[in-house]
């Protein structure tokens, strides 16, 4: 790698950090409350992490933050399987490497159901997906 290439990479890295901070500060302003900011920041990080993971496996990666929030809200922020506990993880109905991170493949699930789901797959409560496979607001 040349010095010029290294300078360019450092410049891009610096730009990324600065813009990331700008995006986060804008989200904080728009959220209105610290609680709303923490929720949106957590879910943004969750979606981004799953998108990166799906891409690294060469799987489909189309889920957006808006789609994820609609899905979570359609289950009242509770586990899609037991509907008793708050959701804790983004669960893939079809294994990530096969089904990707898409609106039709992602569900909000508690850790207990996620663990049990791997052994004996239950069906989620209610169908919150339209025929095109994307989430709809209830």
Model-derived regions: residue spans:
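Intrinsically disordered, low-complexity regulatory regions
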Residues: 53-54
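Short metal-coordination and nucleic-acid-contact micro-motifs, chiefly zinc-binding Cys/His arrays
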Residues: 45, 72-76, 102-106
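Residue-level marker of regulatory loop/turn positions in helix-turn-helix DNA-binding domains and
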Residues: 37, 41, 60, 71, ...
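Short Cys/His-centered divalent metal-binding micro-motifs
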Residues: 106-131
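Short cysteine-rich loop/turn motifs with clustered Cys
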Residues: 59-89, 110
């Amino acid at each position: 790698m040349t010095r010029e290439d290294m300078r360019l990479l450092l410049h891009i890295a610096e730009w990324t950090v600065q813009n990331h901070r700008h995006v986060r500060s804008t989200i904080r302003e728009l959220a209105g409350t610290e609680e709303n900011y923490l929720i949106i920041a957590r879910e943004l990080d969750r979606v981004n992490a799953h998108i990166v993971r799906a891409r690294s496996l060469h799987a489909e990666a189309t889920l957006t933050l808006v789609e994820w929030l609609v899905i979570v809200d359609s289950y009242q922020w509770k586990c899609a399987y037991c509907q008793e506990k708050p959701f804790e993880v983004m669960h893939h109905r079809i294994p990530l490497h096969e089904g990707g991170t898409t609106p039709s493949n992602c569900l909000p699930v508690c850790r207990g159901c996620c663990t049990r789901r791997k052994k004996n797959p239950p069906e989620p409560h209610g169908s919150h997906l339209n025929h095109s496979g994307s989430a709809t607001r209830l």
